[in-house]
Amino acid sequence: MGLSAAQRQVVASTWKDIAGSDNGAGVGKECFTKFLSAHHDIAAVFGFSGASDPGVADLGAKVLAQIGVAVSHLGDEGKMVAEMKAVGVRHKGYGYKHIKAEYFEPLGASLLSAMEHRIGGKMTAAAKDAWAAAYADISGALISGLQS
């Protein structure tokens, strides 16, 4: 756990392009559309009828906003972990007790694909590695909160 200084810099610099003018909402929608299209059975966990459900865009926007929070705390790993763990704990309270740890790996793949789609060539091999490491830290903290 923990990103190197170089990885933190890459994540922070690419986040500006990933977030874009919509704070990442488009990336979030694309991420969850891909994820739920590939994993139809998981849509019901979120109360969606499928990947085209209108709530998918809203969920994607919320998730990307939380990623933005995590990115803002990359220099303070303890704070980032605490923030993301708290998000996981809150989700238990929302009734999302059926979210499983194994959902996060394919979701991460969909997220990285959507990010790359948005920023194109700026998603270099180093950026992919940095974002994969950041996502591992973020999702690990979320899972910890969900399972607490």
Swiss-Prot record:
- Read off the SUPFAM superfamilies from this record: Globin-like
Where does the Globin domain start and stop, copy by copy?
Answer: 2-147
Name of the molecule in the record = Globin, monomeric component M-IV
Subunit composition and interactions: Monomer.
- Name one molecular function that GO assigns to this entry: oxygen carrier activity
Residues where heme b binds: 91
Q: Which terms are listed as keywords in the entry?
A: Heme, Iron, Metal-binding, Oxygen transport, Transport
Pfam families in UniProt: Globin
Q: Which InterPro entries match?
A: Globin, Globin-like_OT, Globin-like_sf, Globin/Proto, Mb-like_M
Q: Which family does it belong to?
A: Belongs to the globin family.
UniProt superkingdom? Eukaryota
